[in-house]
């Protein structure tokens, strides 16, 4: 525990900035490089850093497996909901032009919402994969695959 004090202090300082940078990449993705996938991976990297430093159990207290599943569903529903909204408003699936009064405004709204859905889904997926793999105990592995 004592040998990790520097890592714990530095990570407590860095993690909020990592998550803030993920939000910047998310919202800047409409105007330049970046977007949902990149932001989702950066956000998940911040969570994974927390899990590595403080442990997977402590990280799961912050974001439970059930909450991660809910985020997965919300991300997919947001993405597909924008597509369905385009159909209901008289356009094609994922036709952003019909989402606002002007085509440019509709594209802006549509891209932000779709990229946000992608970001949520990617972050939740990467977090789920990490916690599933990192949360296994060696005994469980040996029972399932035998001793090597």
What do these predicted ranges mean?
Residues 1-9, 135-148:
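Extramembrane terminal tails and long inter-domain/linker segments of multi-pass membrane proteins
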Residues 5-7, 42-66:
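Cytoplasmic juxtamembrane interface segments
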Residues 30-43:
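Short, non-helical or kinked segments that cap or interrupt transmembrane helices
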Residues 45-51, 114-128:
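Hydrophobic cores of alpha-helical transmembrane segments in multi-pass inner/ER membrane proteins
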Residues 55-60, 83-98:
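Transmembrane alpha-helix boundary signature
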Residues 69-85:
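Hydrophobic alpha-helical membrane-insertion segments
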Residues 101-116:
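Short aromatic-rich membrane-water interface segments that cap or initiate transmembrane helices
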């Amino acid at each position: 525990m004592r040998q990790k004090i520097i890592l714990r202090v530095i990570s407590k300082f860095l993690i909020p900035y990592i998550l803030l940078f993920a939000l910047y990449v998310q919202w800047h993705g409409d105007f330049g490089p970046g977007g949902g996938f990149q932001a989702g991976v950066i956000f998940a990297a911040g969570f994974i850093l927390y899990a590595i430093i403080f442990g997977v159990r402590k990280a799961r207290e912050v974001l439970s497996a059930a909450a991660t599943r809910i985020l997965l569903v919300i991300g997919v529903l947001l993405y597909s909901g924008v597509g369905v909204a385009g159909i209901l408003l008289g356009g094609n699936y994922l036709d952003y032009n019909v989402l606002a009064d002007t085509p440019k405004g509709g594209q802006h709204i549509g891209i932000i919402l779709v990229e946000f859905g992608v970001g949520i889904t990617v972050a939740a997926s990467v977090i789920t994969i990490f916690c599933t793999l990192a949360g296994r105990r060696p005994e469980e592995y040996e029972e399932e695959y035998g001793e090597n």
